[in-house]
Amino acid sequence: MKEPNATHEKAQSFFEGLWKRGDPWELETSEFEQAKYADEISILAGRRYGRALEIGCGIGSFTRLLTGPCDSILALDISPTAIARAHERGLHAVEFREQNIMHFDLERERPWDLIVLNETIYYLGWLYSFFDVAWLATQLFDATATSGRLLMANTCGGLTNYLLRPPIIRTYHDLFVNVAYQTTAERTFRGVKNGVEIEALISVFSKLPA
């Protein structure tokens, strides 16, 4: 990984700047975001998850909902401000930790029954090389328990941000398939936020028994 310290500092500075302004994505107040979260939780229905790892938890907006199907959660975010605010929720069986996933020891803390990448992967692709993201995907697969799952949700339509273009989001999706995850469920969530029609691709990948 090239210049890990410089990249980490860039990432932390970027997200700190956003979270210090409040709720930059309106995760707590947007009807669109709340409906998308509910759709993500519903796609996980039908089983419980013993240990869950949430990557890029922010202020814990989605973490709160994960406490329903999950027995214990480790929620990571690179922003100290976000983690401090997440702690204020006082969620049971949740550990919020300031951590860059690219520096996290997945080998030491595995296995995970559920891994969550909620609107996170394209930021990693912006900050790091595709090789680095591919290596992370491989490590996540290895750290997933047999029959465990990975939930990935990404905005992929309706906005002009080049990070969110459907072909780019599909490339990340295919990356996780190529490291041996199997697509268990997938759907497109559609809604309107601030007058803009937006689509989000919600995917559940599974690590099937060998």
Predicted regions and their residues:
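Class I (Rossmann-like) S-adenosyl-L-methionine-dependent methyltransferase catalytic domain
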Residues: 1-108, 127-141, 148-210
